Amino acid sequence: MDGRYDVIGTGSLLGVKGYGKEPKSVPVGSETVIDMYPLDFEEFLWANGIETPVIELLKTCLQNEKTVPEALHKRMKQLLLQYTVVGGMPDVVQTFVSTKQMDEVLQIQRDIVRSYEDDMIKYAEKKDKSRIKECFQSIPKQLSKENKKFQYSIVKKGSTASKYAGSLQWIEDAGTVSYTHLRAHET
């Protein structure tokens, strides 16, 4: 590059991190790495045209344990339900905001999941590929249980952490999932 243009590259860093293969080199030059994450609920609200003063009012009510005005409460419940279905992936959110077509939203979500699975096949070591994919595909069942602790027996009957823990770690390292550790509500 001769410096006349800024170039932005995106994508999986699994190949660069060296999963399953010798680490590949990163092009030399001015490089800034920015870790990107899905939109959180507040960002989802912004994308849906909810302005900052409204969000601040909601935060103030919640922080001070005050009643949220009825109209705001109704709208936030609706948006929270939509967020739980749409999620925070930018392309999915943009499609939802611009079209409100759930069939298009679901197709983009399926495409994202397929690309995650393709990365597993491309970058994981051969001996780990099936276990990683099994762990990944068990996530919906894991999340639908009342007990939210990851249970290896749901991945495969009789399975243990010693067999699958590395697979789950691979999925987290890939940025596909992130662990949430809950603590008891403090009163």
Show the residue positions of the predicted features.
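Conserved nucleotide-binding/hydrolysis micro-motifs of P-loop NTPases
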Residues: S12-K17, L39-E42
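Hydrophobic/aromatic beta-strand patches that form the interior of the parallel beta-sheet core
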Residues: I8, T32-I34
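Conserved nucleotide-sensing/catalytic segment adjacent to the nucleotide-binding pocket
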Residues: M1
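Structural recognition of the conserved hydrophobic beta-strand(s) that form the central parallel beta-sheet
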Residues: D6-S12
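Short regulatory helix/loop adjacent to the ATP-binding pocket of P-loop NTPases
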Residues: V16-E31
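Amphipathic alpha-helical segments of the small helical/lid subdomains adjacent to P-loop NTPase cores
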Residues: I34-D91
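Accessory nucleic acid-recognition modules appended to NTPase machines
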Residues: S98, M102-E186
